[in-house]
Amino acid sequence: MKGCALPVLDSIIFDMDGLLIDTEIISYQLYSALLAPYGFTVSLHDYAETYSGKTEEKNVTTLLEHYPLPLSREECFARISAMEKEFLAKGVALKPGAKELLTYLKEHGYKIALASSSIADRAYGILDQHGIRGCFDAFVFGPDLPKGRGKPAPDIFLIACQKLGTTPAQALVLEDSEAGIQAAHSACIPVLCVPDLHHPAPAYAAMTAAIL
């Protein structure tokens, strides 16, 4: 009896913040700056474990649950948005090798998606700054997801597969955050982790195909 052929990898799905773009450290600095006037701090480790890879909506909810800030959700969003615009206006660095990898994959016929918890305007602005928006065949952003279904839920990667016209078995995810790793694992898509702010905890490392 002939064996079944394994699915052929045809699609690569990228996270953005902390993987392609060096923005997670900026987000950490934003949250630290927001908390400091009220006498609170957040460690880099706690930021990476609690906030990295998640939507701003989820993160603002978590911030207000963890810290007794005299701010409404709307005020918190507004302050973070204003501070981030100042940071991003100064320019954000691409991760080393990111543009070269995207170019290689494009030239070799892979379908490429961006699956980011960011909002579209913010992401497009950053991608256009580096001239890499055209490398992607599909985009999925945080606001595209059902309420409460951002990472670590699998929806963002399953939608990316649908947009690319591929299956989870034919895709590969590149991620840096634990939330993203769990989302890919739950979607039954192999995931490579490229750590940014910290190395994934053992439970998340076990979900990856490899840690680079």
Q: Where does each model-flagged region fall?
A:
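Substrate-recognition "cap/lid" segment bordering the active-site pocket of phosphatases
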Residues: I119-L172, E178, Q182, S186, ...
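Conserved SAM-binding loop
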Residues: L20, L94, I112, V173-L174
